[in-house]
Amino acid sequence: MKLYHSLSEAIAAFQRKSREVLAIISFNGQAYFVFRSNPNAQISTIMQAHAKMAIGNELRHCDTKKVDVVRKQKLYNFMMNSGVSQQFPQNAQHAEENLIRNFPNILKKFKAEFPNQKINTIEIFLTHSPCSSKGKKKYSAQCHINNFFLPPGCDKKLAAFFKKENYKSIDKQLFDKKVKLRIHYNHQFDPSIEYNNHFIREADPILKTVLCDGLDSRVKH
């Protein structure tokens, strides 16, 4: 898990894939960590099969977008039978969940980089607003992450973990008594859910420009 020293540095290090969600967390505006969403094992395997076929086309000086569907399916079946799918997480994981899952690790990174410094500000930047069990789109029902029991929907997970300060239990001495916390999102994932509060809110125009220029303009299809 790499530590970046600015938002622009963190954004520049990643090329977002199509339909991929990124979550960037900042401690004190000094340390930034990036987390990606990932599909389930089967989808990850077929995506890798597609990528291999595209590379093969490129080496033969053929159109990388015109992948032979039959050959790709045969390669996918071979990869599945060879156990390639076992290399990937079996279930789809949202970026917010991966952030919570790796929270203990990034605290260790922060302490190593900034010894004797307490965390007083946490900001999270999302490419898309969190999924919600109250919305019309699919949401994550995964409830157990790092021995924490968290409710369905990433909006409730973030609230339970951060707003209720359960994150402090991982290393109580590392945080100030009062920590400023804010979550910004760039795009609205589910139009049926509106976030307009001090905890989760749409990014302001300047921040949206930074996120769009850095992440949306370089989406890898």
Region spans (language model):
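Zinc-dependent deaminase catalytic domain
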Residues: 1-221
